[in-house]
Design a protein with these regions (language model features):
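Conserved PLP-enzyme active-site core in the AAT-like
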Residues: 1-132, 137
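Conserved PLP cofactor-binding pocket of PLP-dependent enzymes
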Residues: 140
């Protein structure tokens, strides 16, 4: 699931979705959350019983628009091992430079997300008071 969703920023209750998915009988149901929009600063899906967290590192995590990459974080070692095996076999691992560039961006992630949220809140104020704007989609 992607929450907030793109483009309407609809919110899914991750914990409720995970509870429903994990309570189903039969095969294991994996709950995966695309956390690109929120980053780990604003939302921690593993703490809400998601099994996998997926993100586009190109966006907020990197912060400098100089890396193309993504990440998958798993809640249990079995999933970590399975993902690592397939990523290694298929050559889907990041280069050392891309890894370093992403780590560089992570140093300022908290400050940048704080600024993004403040700027977005101000834009919402402006747009909601503008007579030509009929709807503002804002989960905050």
């Amino acid at each position: 699931m992607e929450t907030p969703s793109n483009p309407l920023l609809r919110i899914t209750d991750i914990a409720a979705a995970a509870e429903l998915a994990h309570s189903s009988a039969g095969k294991r149901t994996v709950v995966a959350v695309d956390n690109t929009f929120c980053s780990p600063i604003l939302q921690q899906p593993l703490s809400l019983d998601a099994d996998l967290v997926i993100a586009s590192d190109t966006k907020f995590l990197n912060g400098h628009s100089d890396v193309i990459g993504g990440s998958v974080v798993a809640a249990n070692q079995q999933d970590v091992d399975l993902i690592a095996f397939h990523a290694n076999m298929m050559g889907l691992t990041a280069s050392p430079l891309d890894s370093w560039l992403t780590l560089r961006g992570l140093r300022t992630l908290g400050v940048r997300m704080q600024a993004h949220c403040a700027n977005a809140a101000r834009m919402v104020e402006i747009l909601q008071s503008h007579q030509a704007v009929t709807a503002v989609y804002w989960p905050g």
